Amino acid sequence: MRNFSVFERFSKAFKDHPSLTRILVVSTISGGGLIAYSEANASYGANGGAVVETGTKKKKVVLLGTGWAGTSFLKNLNNSQYEVQIISPRNYFAFTPLLPSVTCGTVEARSVVEPIRNIGRKNVDTSYLEAECFKIDPASKKVYCRSKQGLSSNGKKEFSVDYDYLVIATGAQSNTFNIPGVEENCHFLKEVEDAQRIRKTVIDSFEKASLPELSDEERKRILHFVVVGGGPTGVEFAAELHDFVTEDLVSLYPRAKGSVRITLLEAADHILTMFDKRITEFAEEKFSRDGIDVKLGSMVTKVNEKDISAKTKGGEVSSIPYGMIVWSTGIGTRPVIKDFMKQIGQGNRRALATDEWLRVEGTDNIYALGDCATINQRKVMEDVSAIFSKADKDKSGTLTLKEFQEAMDDICVRYPQVELYLKSKRMRGIADLLKEAETDDVSKNNIELKIEEFKSALSQVDSQVKFLPATAQVAAQQGAYLAKCFDRMEECEKSPEGPIRMRGEGRHRFRPFRYRHLGQFAPLGGEQTAAQLPGDWVSIGHSSQWLWYSVYASKQVSWRTRVLVVSDWMRRFIFGRDSSSI
């Protein structure tokens, strides 16, 4: 037990962590706005956005999954005409960005979870089944499930559920790349249970290393923690573990002092490759100062019970003894999704292919979002002839500047990559785009654009078609978007509000999904965080850590979890992290 009193620890916390005062101020100031926001949403759900129920039979929506995508869909759905059946083996939502904090006791596991039955609009008829879907049958509109509790209500472990609409938000599983020994010997960090197991293993490692008869070599092996994967999750866990060891465990386990090592293996040339170069360089330098051994260009080839084999790009193979490995190298497809993909002719893909409205290609009334799906953004050049023909209203074979402008308005809505291309090239408008068409004088209003010039102007925009990252931010936006589509399904069936159909007549029912990147964080330990926000804005250091606290507190799905998470942060500042092995 520590020799500090509560008051001494409190004083030490404020002295060692001057940011604590600012965190309290930020939390207090932002609290009023968050309350107002929550109350505004509650009012909208009760009155402004409600749909008056008629005597018609409710459409049944089956929602598979209670992760970011599924929970966002459930929270934002506000139409009483639906009966929502939630099916998931997990009866709660987990705030996964804080899982690295759970592994080291910075935040408690129960603080980042919210029971799924507490989530959702009051006017929407919802029910939950704790079961795992193992088969989807699009022909009969059924999903087949296996109860987690052993038996279902009719005495059988397996049962089926009918649907009118199916929303697939099952997420993904950790990708082992079929490397021998990974499944048997590594810890993953995808679920709350994973974080709890890691935390217990860390404490058990220190307890084992404190035994008197242990050799120095064995003690060093037990206290060697290896992280595979230099993405945000792997980097944040390594940083959290370093803080846990240096701030709490070393003083509690004197035998362990000098024997603890943390190694980060990354197959690429740098860690945090999805971040700005400035963040990547700072993270690598900070880890070097902190004593975290970052091995770049190292690819794991095999994992044994007590050592891991890694190969460099030069072909050199080394054996690294370890006490615990955390595997954080990417995501793979769940078995139920693989089976479904084979049924609908998508067997060679890594994720379900959807269109821009999140509809699974080759199916009816089935939607997929989050990590289990990827959007197949249609390319402009696939429709360029049809676009030109529709824009050429007088059938003259050329487009006037006005016709081109009107066509571009529709194109920008239907094909998000056009707007991204204009921004990437820092183009101010249509005139800049026309310069690439090699027209004589783009300043003239009587310009006439032939189809070859039209194609030339749009030839490069498809270079901005990119797969969306598998992040909570993407999944949450997709869930909110799909909920709004469902809310307005009947209304938009009669009066479509989407872009003009380039092939065919009329309009699409809805505007296609468009992802808005709001920024990303990379906590690096020592009360320092790297933040990359839209507009090429990069901030690194203690100030970004305060922003991280504020944003992550505000993004909690309930006031219960928000209060618990902030309380855990305060507890850690004052009392330190809990080192008990429970």
From Swiss-Prot:
Chain sites annotated for binding NAD(+): 223-259
Binding site for Ca(2+): 392, 394, 396, 398, 403
Cofactor binding note: Binds 1 FAD per subunit.
Cellular localisation: Mitochondrion inner membrane; Peroxisome
Residues annotated to bind FAD: 60-90
One GO location term (cellular component): peroxisome
pH effects: Optimum pH is 6.8 with NADPH as substrate and 6.8-7.8 with NADH as substrate.
Annotated InterPro entries: EF-hand-dom_pair, EF_Hand_1_Ca_BS, EF_hand_dom, FAD/NAD-bd_sf, FAD/NAD-binding_dom, NDH-2, NDH2-like_C
Cofactor annotation: FAD
Gene Ontology MF terms in the entry: calcium ion binding; NADH:ubiquinone reductase (non-electrogenic) activity; oxidoreductase activity
Segments carrying motif Microbody targeting signal: 573-582
Topology in the lipid bilayer: Peripheral membrane protein
Induction profile: Follows a circadian regulation; up-regulated in a diurnal manner. Accumulates in response to ammonium but repressed by nitrate. Induced by chloramphenicol (Chl), paraquat (Par), rotenone (Rot) and salicylic acid (SA).
Tissue: Mostly expressed in seedlings and roots and, to a lower extent, in cotyledons, leaves, stems, buds and flowers.
Taxonomic superkingdom: Eukaryota
Keywords: Calcium, FAD, Flavoprotein, Membrane, Metal-binding, Mitochondrion, Mitochondrion inner membrane, NAD, NADP, Oxidoreductase, Peroxisome, Transit peptide
E.C. numbers: 1.6.5.9
Gene3D superfamilies hit by this protein: 3.50.50.100
Reaction catalysis annotation: a quinone + NADH + H(+) = a quinol + NAD(+); a ubiquinone + NADH + H(+) = a ubiquinol + NAD(+)
One Pfam family of this chain: Pyr_redox_2
Family label: Belongs to the NADH dehydrogenase family.
Function noted in UniProt: Alternative NADH-ubiquinone oxidoreductase which catalyzes the oxidation of mitochondrial NADH does not translocate protons across the inner mitochondrial membrane. Calcium-dependent NAD(P)H dehydrogenase; more efficient on NADH. Binds calcium ions.
Protein name as catalogued: External alternative NAD(P)H-ubiquinone oxidoreductase B2, mitochondrial
Lineage: Eukaryota, Viridiplantae, Streptophyta, Embryophyta, Tracheophyta
Gene name, Swiss-Prot/TrEMBL: NDB2
